[in-house]
Amino acid sequence: MNDNREQLTQQIIDAGRFLYGRGWSPATSSNYSARLDEGRALLTVSGRHKGQLGFDDVLATDLAGNSLEPGKKPSAETLLHTQLYAWSPAIGAVLHTHSVNATVLSRLVRGDRLVLQDYELQKAFAGVTTHEGQVEVPIFDNDQDIARLAGRVQPWLEAHPDCPGYLIRGHGLYTWGARMSDALRQVEAFEFLFECELKVLSLSR
């Protein structure tokens, strides 16, 4: 294992422990990845407990989502990671989490997007410099056909190049960043904002 792969794998392992510890990636849910080079990514192996990841729980894939390591099966949702790397060369890490807040809020919001507005913490997202604007988070209906789901995600990405993440209804959050630390920051920001939105909804009833 070369130094770069070892470092990126350790970042994925550390991310898993952190996200599991916060309750955002329970049991074997969720999947994480990091760009290895121009044509490859490292992803978590399917079905592994995210709070107990080791070096054997990460594998390399090409950007079509195909495993490059015989005997290791990538997550069924690998294509949702690799499409992001293919879409933007600036993306270096992708995190998919299954928190209670993201799951419940995605079911409560009517329509195809969540609009975050007037929150100071919006500035935690890459490229956002003020609380005064809107951050639109698209919500896609869950689909076991991942290629079909990716086909619905792609037009949104193309039309919204500053998009910081998206929700899958009743499922969870996808977010990303130039580095793993950036992606983790965005997960934290989303979770705070999702909790705020849920409290607003509960108090307004």
Swiss-Prot record:
Pfam families: Aldolase_II. One of its GO terms (molecular function) is zinc ion binding. InterPro entries: Aldolase_II/adducin_N (IPR001303), Aldolase_II/adducin_N_sf (IPR036409), MethylthioRu-1-P_deHdtase_MtnB (IPR017714). Disulfide bonds: none annotated. Zn(2+) binds at residues 96, 98. Pathway: Amino-acid biosynthesis; L-methionine biosynthesis via salvage pathway; L-methionine from S-methyl-5-thio-alpha-D-ribose 1-phosphate: step 2/6. It catalyses: 5-(methylsulfanyl)-D-ribulose 1-phosphate = 5-methylsulfanyl-2,3-dioxopentyl phosphate + H2O. One of its GO terms (cellular component) is cytoplasm. Belongs to the aldolase class II family. MtnB subfamily. This is Methylthioribulose-1-phosphate dehydratase. It comes from Pseudomonas paraeruginosa (strain DSM 24068 / PA7). The lineage of its organism: Bacteria, Pseudomonadati, Pseudomonadota, Gammaproteobacteria, Pseudomonadales.
